[in-house]
Amino acid sequence: MTPEPAFLLHKRPYRETSALVELLTLSQGRVRAVAQGVQRPGSRSRGRLQPFSPLHVTWVGGGELKRLRLMESRGATALLAGEGLLCGLYANELLTRTLPVELPVSEVFAFYTALLEALPRPDARAGGLRRLEVSLLEALDALPRFTTPDGGELDPQVRYVLDAFSRAFRPGQPGLDGRTLRLLGAGDWDAPGLAGPSKAVTRAALAPLLGSRPLRSRELMRQLAERRRAKAGS
């Protein structure tokens, strides 16, 4: 096969010297594979197979679990720390948990690549995350419909909550006002003043896909925020 652009989403030890890996690839989406020998001391592939590092990979195997053959770097690893690192870990965990195996999601791949470029800049993180989340929801046919459950227009003066069954909005509290939701429905996900509402909508839309098990990366971000508040108040 032609070398495929990819990023590592998750890796865990397998047997003595190998690893089970989850990859996000350009044309095949999420791919599960065995990386043989990468845990062996001195393995050249060990240093390449790292999160946030652009890769070229090839694999063999017709089942769900592939065997990696080629692992080459195709660029510099994104250098992330603190909140930027936690946002990157969140993106990796989100994609691992929600993407079906081998569903082509080239737009998700493009927005993930753009996110890694944005994460070192604090002012660009939220917008990058929302664009990735929206592209993921679109790929999974789970993006909210910015209407009422019966297809009616949202009233700018009424507050709404997302109905998970219909993926539309019904009146409810505390909710978001119809004017804000109509702006989001027009695609203004990172317009000024919409950072909080867009985060609330994507989180609500992703919740049914994630199920009841919490994301570890969200807990780490909560702990970081608490430490910052405690430090600011001391």
Model region roles, listed by residue range:
Residues 1-20, 24-234:
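Non-catalytic alpha-helical scaffolds and adjoining flexible linkers that form interface surfaces
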